Every structure is written in structure tokens, then in C-alpha cells.
Amino acid sequence: MTSVWKRLQRVGKRAAKFQFVACYHELVLECTKKWQPDKLVVVWTRRNRRICSKAHSWQPGIQNPYRGTVVWMVPENVDISVTLYRDPHVDQYEAKEWTFIIENESKGQRKVLATAEVDLARHAGPVPVQVPVRLRLKPKSVKVVQAELSLTLSGVLLREGRATDDDMQSLASLMSVKPSDVGNLDDFAESDEDEAHGPGAPEARARVPQPDPSRELKTLCEEEEEGQGRPQQAVASPSNAEDTSPAPVSAPAPPARTSRGQGSERANEAGGQVGPEAPRPPETSPEMRSSRQPAQDTAPTPAPRLRKGSDALRPPVPQGEDEVPKASGAPPAGLGSARETQAQACPQEGTEAHGARLGPSIEDKGSGDPFGRQRLKAEEMDTEDRPEASGVDTEPRSGGREANTKRSGVRAGEAEESSAVCQVDAEQRSKVRHVDTKGPEATGVMPEARCRGTPEAPPRGSQGRLGVRTRDEAPSGLSLPPAEPAGHSGQLGDLEGARAAAGQEREGAEVRGGAPGIEGTGLEQGPSVGAISTRPQVSSWQGALLSTAQGAISRGLGGWEAEAGGSGDLETETEVVGLEVLGTQEKEVEGSGFPETRTLEIEILGALEKEAARSRVLESEVAGTAQCEGLETQETEVGVIETPGTETEVLGTQKTEAGGSGVLQTRTTIAETEVLVTQEISGDLGPLKIEDTIQSEMLGTQETEVEASRVPESEAEGTEAKILGTQEITARDSGVREIEAEIAESDILVAQEIEVGLLGVLGIETGAAEGAILGTQEIASRDSGVPGLEADTTGIQVKEVGGSEVPEIATGTAETEILGTQEIASRSSGVPGLESEVAGAQETEVGGSGISGPEAGMAEARVLMTRKTEIIVPEAEKEEAQTSGVQEAETRVGSALKYEALRAPVTQPRVLGSQEAKAEISGVQGSETQVLRVQEAEAGVWGMSEGKSGAWGAQEAEMKVLESPENKSGTFKAQEAEAGVLGNEKGKEAEGSLTEASLPEAQVASGAGAGAPRASSPEKAEEDRRLPGSQAPPALVSSSQSLLEWCQEVTTGYRGVRITNFTTSWRNGLAFCAILHRFYPDKIDYASLDPLNIKQNNKQAFDGFAALGVSRLLEPADMVLLSVPDKLIVMTYLCQIRAFCTGQELQLVQLEGGGGAGTYRVGSAQPSPPDDLDAGGLAQRLRGHGAEGPQEPKEAADRADGAAPGVASRNAVAGRASKDGGAEAPRESRPAEVPAEGLVNGAGAPGGGGVRLRRPSVNGEPGSVPPPRAHGSFSHVRDADLLKKRRSRLRNSSSFSMDDPDAGAMGAAAAEGQAPDPSPAPGPPTAADSQQPPGGSSPSEEPPPSPGEEAGLQRFQDTSQYVCAELQALEQEQRQIDGRAAEVEMQLRSLMESGANKLQEEVLIQEWFTLVNKKNALIRRQDQLQLLMEEQDLERRFELLSRELRAMLAIEDWQKTSAQQHREQLLLEELVSLVNQRDELVRDLDHKERIALEEDERLERGLEQRRRKLSRQLSRRERCVLS
């Protein structure tokens, strides 16, 4: 498919269609010995277009038999049609290369021998010309020594037009065709001589597929998942193959290998209990699970995945076929779905959604697998060490296995919906097999664990979603979480290794906690778990938990967050297992401990309020404790994580008992879990920490208790509960059922809570809390060095708690905040108010909703989210690329509300100073970044969920957009930073230059851009507004999910429109028409559209949007010719449409010369410039400038002075005219356009503010300004010929002038300064400006202009100096963006095709959207400059330039950089020059008039004289006659 970016680049350009004809004359080909070509074909090709000549035989030469020729006795002509593009102000066409390829045709196969490229733009011209060409081709085969092709090339211009005209489109480039069968020459692998030195041959041989035993076992999976990369299979397969025989599975290995249906049936027959059961369709009822007869499994589903021995234990994971690509919000089928199937008859949706996300999670898991295996081993050790625990299950184990198998079967049915799950299963299988090899008990446990664990491991990522989904479908909430990034898994791996060392200890905890992931699944099963047999579950849970916990750990804290987030369910299940393991004791502990925890938390909050210093110390201690705990947790990470889950469950139970308060407790528990996770993460981050963790773990739960005591008591209790849980594990048997009952209760409560309206807040909260805690604790580590920050945190917490209307909620929030907020405070340390606002917003939400528990949870989640964001912010400063990803993740994780709240604090930390930020960042950056990435992955996973999570994601995305502006001195600088364009400069700018005052302004600007002015408490207002999701105009598109949801929302209610993806949903054009009709009903008659008329529907929509100013990327042919439209093009086009329709188009604030990136902001209406910028002020400026004119020759200066009064008066007139005309309002720095002409460029933001005219091109230093134009230069302004000459001169003097490259460079810089679109008029200094440190935070601190540049400036005298400079700067900026966009598009397309890394794909999509928005801003700005440059009417030109100057003068002098000041000087010079020209015109007119009057008088006198003379003659005649 044609490049999306190239289409975007063509917008606004001129196109010319040429017909090129190549006439072949001779081909000379020299070959190596022992080989000669058979038939030779010359191919003229570009992309997928191939024009082939006839096949000709090669005739060896007489002198050199290895050098032969092909001679065309009758020249052979081949012709092609090519569309070439050029900028409107340039005559040279852009390069377009076509390639000549020499191919050898032998036995029906073609091999490439040599190639050469020809740039057709060099041969294109208005006049047909024939050019003889002799091409030296580059050999592509070792068999070719030399090749030359002689031909004649001619080009004929067919027609010219706009790049977007229908007849300019190349159908061939619209078609997405697979390349032909001509492969790169493998150098004829069949020849023996090539084996030694022919690189192609070995490769070719290596490519030959060789049977792989492990793959044979997975034939079904592979076939089902064909086309989807399964990187993990290879890794897992060897171990699977090895483990197959030892696996204690009753089913023999051979049956496992059987293919598809047969395999499953045979396995069932042969392997009584364990035989792989055919995956059950999601409809399978829970009874099927409970039943233990494999025979009962439904007939093998179409493609049951037969896994090797132990694989059978694992539920085959169904692929989500259609859903996979969507990454829908439904929880992944994996574990959750299996249980969901039981709990709900319709888990398929969730499953499919899960499938979509499974992909990434699987990969992550793959990386985490090694650790998972270690965990498994540790678990095995554990099971061996604790025969009781395993023993409990041992009896029913066979039954348990069956049950598990069946569950796995059920899951399998669901699992098949998600290919990712399959991969996860493969990984887990290997783990399971490890366990199996060690012992039947372990095997029994592990298989079951695998059955559950496998899905579970995946579910964690999706659990993040689960959090969201859980609320929707309480039971089916388990979704497979995307695995955390490989980096995380690597770190986790280290931790896991340490844990493996302390395996037994952990196992106790893991048995409890290990279940969390698995039990998360159990949650949904809740009662079904009990029905199946709690003990077997427990044992299996242990194994599974261990594996799961390890998997979770390997996946990363992010996974845990997802679990916690998803969590109500996961934790509940975890609790089910954990509770079972812990037994009643844990109940008691939890029951007694949690209330105490609340009290303690409240007390802690109070103490924090009273003693900030103490709180700091405590916080540092807490941070240390958290780390210690993290270490312990890491040991028991599984245990801890699970334990938190257990605690959460207990809390849930208590919730049942305590009612609403229980919810808070649950959240608190979640927060604790997150804290633990965070700590673990921090431990993971540092190997030393890991060691410490191991040590602390070794020390025993006592340490955990001690640490817990340091941490809020709730956490301490949690750890204690976990500790007790270990002890209770022994007593597990007795308390299992009770625990299960409690678990069921907690599950129900959790489900209820979820239903009540957590809206995914639990998931978000958990994820957010975890992320926050993770980041927070890391921050805490950082903060430990910054007591002040912690003190602030304390204050914030106090404020939040006190301000909260719901004390319980506040307590929970405070608790979370204590765990996470304190650290956040450290981050946001300077901004207690913001946090308090956040708390207030949370309270407000809680109060308004009336659901204190859930609301409080939401508030907490937001707080956590906020912290997370804050954490990210400091990181962003130092590692912007990471930050961007992290921010995205965070945004997704948190709701938009949270983000806004977070933003303020985030910016504040920067305000606090780079030192603090650096201190925080330095210690935690790497870990935080990783954590954030993990979270990001999770966030991305559930951010993509289509359900509520989707809504949250969209808002978050919006928040991200707003956030970036605030965080990064420029709305888009942040994103640029993400793209790596700005680099660290942005962070420095933000830190150094952002002032608290500017932050609010930036927020206001972004808020305005979003179309939602903020209330006095922006956080509250934004949160309240955005909760519904659609009330406030969305910010710039930042994720594919948010874009999809916006489209769905906007097209709701339109006939025949159902949007579920970015491809087929848009093909018939009705969806585009619906969006157009929604915002511009007068542009299209929707009722008259025919759903079957694809071409016409799309044409109407595209034409309508093009008329409004939306860059035209799609053509009706795209939709007609392709049954599945190109996803990236559709997404990009919709991104533009959304930005336009919501008024969120980017505005170019200023361009930076010298390679610096420009500054952009969301196009929001800006207040008009101060009134003092009236004509009088302008005139004064002009007058003063004319007087100063340092470089002007005296003569010119005198003229300028003399003209000043006239200038002033004219300025006044022009100024008033512009004001009256409304030009000022649109102030879009669309200098060249009059408001009526759509200065806003259809952006819908007439107040888009003028661009800050900045002319970095001259290198930011006020260089010598050329004197005003010599007089007389415009004496014949209206002479058409002169106008044409003038334009040609302008072209020559522009950047394209060959003789004065310096001038071009300078112009480019200047152009850059103003390149943006309706460049926002700098009204009051925009946030971006204020953020720009006067010294040069702006990337363009350029050296003084070189003499060559000064000369270039002089050359601008004949044209518009200002406009030329701006255009050249614009070109520089475009080159930068184009270079990055080409890379991003390639990466994005490869990721979209493979679906391998959804997280990375989402990050790239956000960067892509940002680049597209910037490109459109530059296009709009270029249009303005083009209009300005072509404007020849002096009056109008003067008006436009004066408007530009007004926009610049709206900025305070002290805020202007040297480049801006120089640009202003250029503008003044241009205006002075214009005034001089006008004066000259007036003088000329006066002079001509005087001459004319004199002539008239002379003629009159002459006539009078003639009359007198005639009269005298007549009188004489009369006399004569009379006489």
C-alpha cells in the first residue's frame, strides 16, 4: 500500500502526470565462468508495478565468451504513466525513482541479476525530450560481473493539477499487491560452486522447513494461529518435548501428537483423567468443569489444541479470531474466561477480547518464562517440602487434575479464542513440565496451576482490563493482562531467581498468594471452585500460584497491577486460594486487622497532618520499608501479591460485613498489594535490592511484619496476614471451605462493587494504585533524599482525607495516598493544592454518585493515577522517550480526570526544580520507567478495551495530550520529546522555565483547546465533565482505542453505521458521511445515501472534508479496490477528522531554525492581543524602527523617517480595518489570509491565535537587516509581466536558489519560525511561550548569521524577506518530521501486520498521530505563507503583514527569544519597505498627475492659440469678401 505519509506530504502540492517511454537498444551482460544466462528480461518497476520486456536470448561474444549481448534489432518500447509532485512555488519536481532490473528466466523461474535506478523527475519537463541513457547496472548475483543497458528515455506531460485530484491518483499504487514471484537472487543454490562462497545458498537451505517434534505436537495451534507470530512456541517446545514423557499425565505422549479432533478424542480415551480435553465452547456450563470425566467434554471443538502431556492439563487457549485484532475490552478468555464461561453463558466476547490482548502478554510472558520456571521449581520444592499442602490436594489431585483439565477444557474452548493465550500456555506448559518432571504431586499441582495459571498469567494484563470488565461482568472479569515489557520481565526474572532461592519460604506465601493470578480466575468460578473441590484447587492453586505468581512477577508489577486492577476478581480468586490456604486464621487476622488498619491509617493521616517532618521521616522509612517489603514481597512476591489479593478478598468479606466501608478496605488492600508490588518492583529494579529482598525474605515474615509496621498498619497487617497465611497453610485444610465461602462472598462483594459502578475504577485503581505505588515507592526511594517532598505529601494526604466528604473514602484514599500519595507528594511536592483538588474531585465524585465505596475507590485510583503520572513526569524530563510511553500507559491506566489532576502536580514537580526531579528520577527512573512501561502495557491492554475501559482510555488519551503540553513547555513538545526530537532539552526547559503561574496558563490553554474551560478548581471541573466521556471535546487523539470510541460515539444513531474497527467498518463510506453530517449537516444529505454505492458515498465524504480543509489521504478507489481498506490510512484520516471537528488541530507556535523542533499547541481560541496594540502603537513601532534602521543606508533611513507619519496613519487604518474585518480575532497568524477566507483553515478555531513569528533561520541572532526596497521597485505593480518576473525572482531567491545556498538556509530557518498552521497569534503569552526559558529553552539558539546569510537576507529585498525566511524554516521543520514519520510508519506497519507487540504498537500510534497533527499544522502554515507571498496588492499585503506583526507584538518583550526578536525586526523591515513602496507609488502618481496637468495646460494653450489664429484668418477673409 502506498505510504500514508507520502500521501500526507502531497497535500497542497501540484501534480503533473507524465507518460515516459523507454526504448531498449542493447544489453551487455558479463558472467562468471561455468554459467551463462538463458533468457533475459528487462523489467521496469516501482513498488508493485512491473513493465516487462519480451524474453531475449543472450548471445556470447566472440572475443570474450563470458561477455554477451542482447541486441534489439527493432527497438522495443515500454511506457509507463507517472505522477510527479512539486511544491507550488518550485518548478522542480520531487524525485521519483523507477528501477530497471535484468532478470534471468529459466525453467519458468526468474532470478534477479542486476538493477539500476533512474530518477524520472530529471527527465520530466513541459516540453517532450528524448534522452539517450546508458545505465551501468549493479550486479545482484555472484554470477554477474558487469551489466550495461542502453536505452532512450522520453517523457511527455499529459496534464497538471492538484495532487489530490482524482485523475492524478495512480491506481497501481492504491492496490496492495503482493510482490511477484521474482525473488532476490539466491545465486542458484543448486550450483555446487556457490556453496562455498554464495551467501544465498546456505540461507536457502536453512529456510527449508524441517520437522520439529514439538511443533508436531502443536499442529492444531499453529494452524489455528497461522499468520500470528508465536515467538514463545519455539522456546517452550523443546522443554515440552522433553517433559512429555516424564509428565505424569495419564494420556500417552503419542496421542498428544495426534492431529486436531482425533488427537483430542484419543487423548481423552487414552489419558483418562489428564488426557487433553477438547476445548469446550464458552457456552460450557460450570457443571462440565466440576464433572471430572474427560469424556464429558464437548466434542472436540473445531481446532482443539493438543498440547503435550502436561499441556493437556492446560486449557488449550482458543484464539479470538476477529477479536484478536481489535484488542477489544472484553476480559481475555484465558483463566477468566474459563471461569467466566462457568459463571456466565456468554464469556465469548470477553474471551475474544482477551485473545486480542493475549498477544502482547504472551510475548512478555515469554520473556518472563524463565523466571516462571524458576518459580515453578520453587513451587515444586514447596510442594515437596509441604506434603500436607500438596497432600491435601494429593488425594483429590487426580480429581483436581480432571477438574482442572476440564476447566482447562472449558478455558480451552474460550482459550482458542485467544491465540495469545496459546502462546502463554506454551510457555506455561514448559513450566508445568518442569514441575511434572520433579514429581507427580508437583505435577498435579502444577498442571492445575498451569491450567489456571496459564490463563492467569495472561489474565494479569487483561486483568487490568478485568478491573474494568470486572465491574461490568463481575464473574467474567478475568482478562488476560498483557505481559509487562521484556525489560520488566528481565528484572522480574532476577527477582524470581532470588525468590527461587528462597523458594520454600515463598511457596508458603505463594501457596497463599500464588493463587492470586490463578485464583483470580477462581474468583469468577467462586462457588464453582468450591464445588469442584477446594483442596485439589488449593494444591493446584499452589503449583499454579507459584507458576502464576512467578509468571505474574515475570510479567512484571504491571501484571500484578493488572491483577490488582482486574482484581476484584483476581484478588478474590487469589483470596479464594489464599483464603483457603490461609484458613480461618487469616479471616480473623484480616477481620481484626483491617478495621485496625483503617483506624491506623486515619491515625497515620492525622499524624501526618500534625507532623510533616515526622511524616517525611516515616515516608522515607515507609519507602525503605516498602523496599524491604518489596524485597520480602519479591521473595513472597507471589505470596505477597497473592496475599494482597487474599487480603483484598478478606477485605471484600469484611466489606460484606462492614458494608460500604469494606470497599474502601478492599481498595486499601489493593493499594497495599500495589505497594508491595511496587516495592517488589523497586527490588527488581536493583539486583542489590533483589538480594536484600531475598535476605529480607530469608529473615522471614518477621521482617515483613516489621516493614509492614513501618508501612501503614494496613499493609503491615496484610503482610502479617500473609505470614499467618503461611502458617495457616498447614491449617489450610480445616479452613479451606470456610475461606472459600468467604472468598465467594468477597467475590460476590467484589462483583457487586464492580457492578455498583467502580466502572473499572477497581482495575484502574488497582493498576493505578499499583503503578502509583510502584512509581511511588520508587519515588519514595527518590524522595527519601527529599524530605520536603514527603512532608508535602503528608500535607496533601491530610488535605485529601480532611476534605473528603466521605471519611471512609478519605481514609482509604489517605491510606493509598500514604502508601503512594506521600511519594507522589514527594513528586508533586510543591503542589499540595493540586492533590487536595484531586482529593476534592474524588470526594465530589463520591458524594455526587452516592456510592461512597466505589467512588472512594475511584478517587483513590485517581489519586494513585495522579501519583503515577507525577512519577512519570520527572522521568519524562530525563527520559522523555520513556516518559512518553509511560505517560501514555499512565494515561490509559488512569482516567482523564486523574490525569488532569495529575498534570498539575506533575508540572509542579518540574517547577519544584530539576534537582528534586532529578533526585527522584535518578534513583527510580530506570525502575519507574520500566514499571511505567509495564503499567503502560497494562494500560495499553485495557486502555484498548472497547468497553468502559475504552472510555477511560480515550479520556486518558485526551488527558495525555493536555498533560504533555503542560508538562512539556509546549503542548506538543512533550510528544516531540517522546519522539526524541527535542531530547532532554524539553525536560530542562520544563524544569528551568516553567513557573507555577505558567502552569495554570498552560492548563487553561489546554483546557480551552479541549473546548472545556476549567472551573476554579480545574481538576474537579475536568473530572466531573469528563466522567461521562463525551461531554468535553476530546483532546488530540493519543490512542487507537480512544479514536475508535470517539467515532462510535459520534456516529451513534446513524442508519447503517456500525463501527467496530478501522477497516471494513468504513468501506461503504456511510461512517465517514455520518461524521460529516454530525458536524456539518449542510454538507451532505445523509438520508439520500445508498449503502451499496461505495464509491459515491466515499467521494461525497472525502470531498466534503477536503472542502473544509482536512488533508485528503483517502480516495474512493481505496475503498472500492480493497475489500479490507488499509488500517493505517483510515486511522490517520480519522485522526485528522477528529482533530478538525473537535477544534483540536495543532497550531504552530513557532519554528526553530538550526535543526531545532518547532513548538506547537492545541488550537484553542486565544484572547485577542491587548488593546494597546492598536494602530498608534504599531505606527510608533514602525516609526522607531525606521529611525533606528541600523543597517539602512542614510538615504533609505531618511525616506523611512519621512514616510513614518504616513505609515502611522496607514497602519492605523489597516489596523482598524483588520480589527473590523475580524482578522484580528482569528489571529491565526494565518497572515496571508483574510478571516473570511478561512484563516482558521477550517480548523474551527478562529481564535487560533497568531503564530509567534520567530525567525530562527537567521540563527536566532538579530542579523543585519536588509534596507528597505529601492524606490521604484513597485512603480508598475499591476503589470502582469512584471508580476511573473517577480515571482520567478522570488523562486530563485528562495531556498532553492542554486547560487546562494546560504540564503536558502536562512530563509528556511525563518520559515521554521512561523511554519505552523493557522499559526496561533500569540495573544497573551501562551503556555508554551511562558515555558520557554528566555535563554533558549527553545531549541534554536543559533549562532550569529554568517556573511553568506546576510547576503541571503539582502537578496530578500526583492521579495518578501519575512515570507521567504518563514518558508525555508518551514521546510526544515518538515524535513525533520518527514524523516521521523517514515521510520514510524515502517515500524507501525510491521507491528500491525505481526501483532507481536501491542504495547509498542500503541506507543507508535500515539507518536504517529502527533506527527500527523504537526504535519497538518505545517501544511496550513505553508498555505498561509504561500498566499502571503503571492499577494501582490500592496494594500492587502500591508494589512496581512500588519496582522502578523500585531500577533508578535502581543508577546511581551522579555518573553521573546533572540530569534523572535529578529523575526519581529524582519517584519518591521518588510512593513517599512511596503510603506516606502506605497509612498513611491503615491509620489509617482502625483508626479504623473502633475505632468498630465501640465500637458493639459499646454494642449489647452495650443488649442487656444489655434483658435485665435483661425479666428484671425477667418476675420481677414470676411473682410476681403466684404470688400
Curated annotation (Swiss-Prot):
Relate the protein's function as given in its record.
Answer: May act as Rab effector protein and play a role in vesicle trafficking.
The cellular location(s) given in this protein's UniProt record come to: Endosome
InterPro entries attached here? Answer: bMERB_dom, CH_dom, CH_dom_sf, F-actin_Monoox_Mical, NT-C2
Q: Where is this region: Disordered?
A: 179-536, 963-1036, 1183-1352
Compositionally biased residues, Polar residues: 230-243
Domain C2 NT-type, residue spans: 8-157
Q: How does it assemble?
A: Interacts with RAB8A, RAB10, RAB13 and RAB15 (in their GTP-bound forms); at least in case of RAB8A can bind 2 molecules of RAB8A simultaneously; ternary complex formation of RAB8A, RAB13 and EHBP1L1 is possible.
Residue positions of motif CAAX motif: 1520-1523
Q: Low complexity bias located where?
A: 327-338, 1005-1016, 1303-1316, 1326-1340
In the record's own words, the domains note is:
The CAAX motif is a signal for prenylation and required for endosomal colocalization with Rab8 and Rab10. The bivalent Mical/EHBP Rab binding (bMERB) domain, mediates binding to Rab8, Rab10, Rab10, Rab13 and Rab15 (in their GTP-bound forms).
Which UniProt keywords are given for this protein, alphabetically ordered? Answer: Coiled coil, Endosome, Phosphoprotein
Residue intervals of the Calponin-homology (CH) domain: 1037-1142
Start and end residues of each bMERB domain: 1349-1501
Phosphoserine occurs at which residues? S170, S173, S191, S285, S310, S367, S430, S895, S964, S1168, S1257, S1273
Q: How is it modified after translation?
A: Prenylated. Farnelysation (predominant) and geranylgeranylation has been observed in vitro.
Q: Where is the composition biased (Basic and acidic residues)?
A: 376-405, 426-439, 1017-1027, 1191-1201, 1217-1231
Q: Which organism is it from?
A: Homo sapiens (Human)
This chain's protein is named: EH domain-binding protein 1-like protein 1
Stored Pfam families: bMERB_dom (PF12130), CH (PF00307), NT-C2 (PF10358)
